[in-house]
Regions:
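A short, charged, amphipathic alpha-helix used as a generic interaction element across diverse proteins
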Residues: 127-129
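Generic signal for short, ordered secondary-structure residues
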Residues: 6, 18-19, 26, 33, ...
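Intrinsically disordered, low-complexity regulatory regions of eukaryotic regulatory proteins
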Residues: 4-5, 23, 70
């Protein structure tokens, strides 16, 4: 099982679109997806594909958006769809965002639904419990 998880790790950010890059890491049986750039109408499809294509195991995961510069309603929609899939599969997940991203998520009252945490360590602790 560990061998499969090691295959998930991507050292460098992968170019998903002109404005979005993605990365995968493994932290104590929790997958951490890290994104940087813009999560918007132009990148939401690639975001969803990147996450779903790399969920080969039934391990909980964190979507780290602390390096996202811009999040629009399409990006929020992609996060909501991901959360709905996780809830259906009973798969643990959490979202971490910088102050701008967190404010956007809280503004539309999705913080609890998306298991929004203030930092990566809080998200990892949440998923270990």
């Amino acid at each position: 099982m560990i061998h499969l998880l090691e295959e998930l790790k991507i050292e460098d950010f992968q170019k998903l679109t002109v404005s979005l890059r993605g990365n995968i890491d493994l932290r104590t049986n929790i997958i951490v997806f890290t994104f940087k750039g813009q999560l918007d109408a132009f990148s939401e499809k690639q975001f969803k594909n990147f996450v779903s294509n790399n969920l080969k195991n039934e391990y909980p995961f964190v979507i780290d958006l602390t390096k996202i510069d811009f999040l629009d309603s399409s990006g929020l929609g992609a996060l909501v769809q991901t959360a709905k899939e996780c809830k259906k599969l009973k798969l643990g997940f959490s979202i971490v965002g910088n102050s701008r991203v967190a404010q956007t998520i809280k503004l539309v009252r999705l913080g609890d639904f998306l298991n929004l945490k203030s930092c990566l360590e809080d998200a990892l602790t949440y998923l270990k419990n």
